[in-house]
Amino acid sequence: MYKRHRKLRNSSAIRNLVKNIYLEKGDLIYPIFIEEGENIKREINSMPGIFRYSIDRIDEELEELKKLGISSILLFGVPLHKDECATEGYNENGVIQNAIRYIKKKYPEFLVIGDVCCCEYTSHGHCGILDEKGNVKNDETLEVLSKIALSYAKAGVDIVAPSDMMDGRVKKISQILSENGFNNIPIMCYSIKYSSSFYGPFREAAGSAPKFGDRKSYQMDFRYSGDALSEVEADLMQGADMVIIKPAMAYLDILYKIKENFGVPVIAYSVSGEYSMIKAAAINGWIDEKSIVMEQMYAFKRAGANAVITYFAKDVARYLDEG
């Protein structure tokens, strides 16, 4: 006698009855690149279908998201001015600060998440302040990050998401938010962020590629898994409310481990390289885009993700409508 597993796979009705992994539009977070300037809608060469928008053109993107039922967005800034100290990152009239104010006034129903990092605002493209040898100075960078987070809070952001990978950033950000009356703003921390080649297209999109060197001294080494739990534990102890796993697809083992050990909300970030590879293969007719994307989304959910940051969010919403 043997177990007949196929009995529960015999028809779509049975498969739908017994499924236990669910995906909803409310699980989707859509990244948006806001470029400083006017009348800008610029497609990103390495990410077909993804654009940079100036604030005066952002309505067309937001209206489409509304119609599709997507209400969570993650903002990245592309400023005109950059310097060694990322001062534009905490400019009260900076591109993201102005975008937050505009969106929250005209589209209050959107959950606006602000990515907190220096790389989009530094002239050298690194995620912090550099010393004379070109190394990122951890504690000096914390001061800048906390200023960026506070400026977002003052502009009306719903969630701050530090992505820099400096030690102690959550504590510093949590302190400055509390001291200024913003203790109710959640911190969605990129607690797990590997030094990955899957980020390539994003760096074109955000104009944030390092001018020299790499980010291996502060982003995590994919050859070592021993620090994953410690990274998350430290961030949670310092005040993080949610954690992001980035990249997601190649690190589902880490995502699962974090969810099992801590039980906190976990966000999977399906990064630009994943998007571009799938798009390129689909454009060439090598894969079925819808099937691949939906399989990927359910994999994130099965591993324990509460939500997914994905450039495919609009497509996924349409697929869900199609059934």
PLM region descriptions:
Residues 11, 20-29, 35-323:
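Alpha/beta enzyme core
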Residues 1-19:
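N-terminal amphipathic/basic leader segments beginning at the initiator methionine
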